[in-house]
Structure formats: C-alpha cells, structure tokens
C-alpha cells in the first residue's frame, strides 16, 4: 500500500459518504475508481499519487446542509495534505487543479498550459477519471460537455505556447 493510499484509509475515506446528486460512492470508493481509470489510461507514478490524493481534503471540509454534503475548498485542502505528505510540486498542482474545468476563478487556462504538455495530459486523464468515478448518469451531459470545452481551450492554449517557444 502506498503512503497516499494509506493516508486515505487512515483519514476515513471509505466511511466518508458523499450525499449529492453526482456521487453514489464514498470518497474512498470514488478515489479507487479514479485511480483505476488513471492506471487504465497509462498513468505514471505521479498521476497515480495525485489520483489517490485529489479528494483527500473532503474528510476535513465536509458540511451537510440537511439535504446534501458539500466539500467547499476541498482541492486546496487536498493540495495542502499532498504537500504535508512530501509530494512533488507536480503532484500538488494536479491535486490543486483537479476541478479546474468547473469554472474556477483563481487559475487561468494560460497558467495551466504553462505547466507543459505532460502535465496537461495528466490533468486531462485525472479530470476524466474524476468524472468516471461519479454517478453514472452524471457522467453524461453538462459535466462531460463542460470538461470537453475546458480541455479544448487548454490544448488550444498549450499549442499556442508551444508554437512560440
């Protein structure tokens, strides 16, 4: 068991339910599905570490509103956990921006593209793995379209940056 997987077990990820329209799995079950997706799509060691830790902050940020669970700011808390575990900046960045396709205002496509093609490829796999680990009916429609539009913009910007250098 890797230190990342051990952290998730010790933090209670398998007991942490996600009551929402887009999740039917606990944080741990969802994470395991994301890791599997990433491995199935050629993930290297760093992407696998990021897949294990992308939702590590959910156990610390979980709030229930009487109907649904919310995990506000969990990517940043997850990135802090990755940093505390001694992960590379590459992994920490993947964890921090794993939800970048959801219209975050604190990062631009230009900034993400500046991290290079390999990092963008890993982010794309993580984004799609994160979606694949959610409720099956949530994987289609708006969320998939939203991620597709984001990835098109990311790769268009990456190609522009690569043509300059």
Set out the residue ranges of the language-model regions:
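Charged substrate- and nucleic-acid-binding regions of tRNA-handling and nucleotidyl-transfer enzymes
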Residues: 119-121, 126-127, 131-165
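Residue-level detector of solvent-exposed, low-hydrophobicity positions
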Residues: 14, 21-23, 30, 61, ...
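Short, polar loop/linker segments at the starts of domains and inter-domain junctions
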Residues: 24, 110-112, 143
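Exposed alpha-helical structural elements
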Residues: 3-6, 10, 46, 90-94, ...
């Amino acid at each position: 068991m890797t230190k990342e997987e051990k952290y998730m077990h010790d933090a209670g990820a398998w007991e942490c339910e996600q009551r929402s329209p887009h999740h039917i799995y606990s944080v741990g079950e969802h994470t395991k599905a994301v890791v599997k997706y990433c491995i199935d799509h050629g993930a290297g060691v760093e992407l696998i570490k990021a897949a294990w830790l992308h939702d590590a902050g959910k156990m610390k940020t979980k709030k229930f509103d009487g109907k649904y669970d919310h995990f506000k700011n969990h990517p940043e808390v997850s990135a802090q956990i990755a940093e505390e575990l001694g992960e590379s900046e590459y992994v920490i960045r993947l964890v921090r921006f794993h939800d970048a396709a959801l219209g975050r205002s604190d990062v631009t496509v230009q900034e993400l593209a500046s991290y290079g093609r390999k990092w963008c490829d890993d982010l794309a796999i993580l984004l799609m793995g994160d979606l694949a680990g959610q409720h099956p009916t949530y994987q289609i429609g708006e969320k998939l379209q939203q991620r597709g539009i984001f990835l098109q913009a990311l790769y268009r910007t990456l190609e522009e940056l690569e043509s300059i250098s």
